[in-house]
């Protein structure tokens, strides 16, 4: 876990991972559909991407799910304690000076975007956290890393009109996935004009 950040209920996936990126992917799909609408006899024109509205949509999706999760936790009588926890024994966690004991303790600390030594995260170079909150569509983007998060951002930005290049050190995109899936994704991305 990043030492300076405490997540809200729902953690990385809900607030700065899976869910917000899927909302961006949906907006990107809508942009692609509008470009291809003439194939279906629907005449429409894409006049651009309003990132303020896209981000409002993303935040609305996250907000609704967060509210639903809070309601679910409450309805199931789950005790939710906000704060930094510390394992003080095999079955006891201390948070804010209070100790909580259970038969089993699950350590689910979430994740955070990493940087590389010597790189300044300054806006021009950014982590996925900053990329998730961009208020503009970049003209050109280099995505360093062809894992799941990298290929999702590459797809979104290409759909929004950016020139995109993915740099992956391993032989294939999404290297943890089946090679046939990886090859199919690479073909699809090349066809869309994403450079690998």
Each predicted region: which residue ranges?
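Beta1/beta-strand and adjacent pyrophosphate-binding region of the FAD-binding site
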Residues: 2, 137-149
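Mid-domain beta-loop-alpha active-site segment that forms a flexible
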Residues: 69, 148-155
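Gly/Ala-rich phosphate-binding loop of Rossmann-like dinucleotide-binding domains
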Residues: 154, 158-159, 190
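Glycine-rich flavin
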Residues: 5-137, 165, 170-174, 178-196
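Short beta-strand element of Class I
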Residues: 1, 163-164
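Structured core elements
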Residues: 143, 152, 165-166
């Amino acid at each position: 876990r990043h030492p300076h950040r405490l997540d809200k209920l729902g953690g990385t996936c809900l607030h700065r991972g899976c869910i917000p990126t899927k909302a961006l992917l949906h907006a990107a799909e809508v942009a692609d559909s509008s470009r291809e609408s003439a194939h279906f006899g629907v005449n429409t024109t894409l006049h651009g991407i309003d990132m303020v509205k896209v981000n409002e949509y993303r935040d609305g999706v996250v907000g609704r799910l967060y509210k639903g999760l809070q309601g679910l936790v409450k309805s199931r009588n789950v005790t939710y304690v906000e704060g930094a926890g510390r394992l003080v024994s095999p079955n006891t966690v201390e948070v804010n000076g209070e100790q909580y004991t259970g038969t089993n303790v699950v350590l689910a600390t979430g994740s955070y975007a990493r940087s590389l030594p010597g790189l300044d995260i300054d806006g021009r170079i950014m982590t996925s956290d900053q990329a998730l909150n961009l208020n503009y569509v970049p003209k050109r983007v280099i995505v360093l890393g062809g894992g799941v998060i990298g290929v999702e951002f590459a797809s979104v930005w290409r759909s929004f009109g950016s020139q995109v290049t993915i740099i992956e050190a391993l032989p294939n995109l999404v290297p943890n996935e089946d090679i046939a899936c990886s090859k199919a994704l690479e073909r699809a991305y090349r066809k869309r004009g994403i450079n690998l």
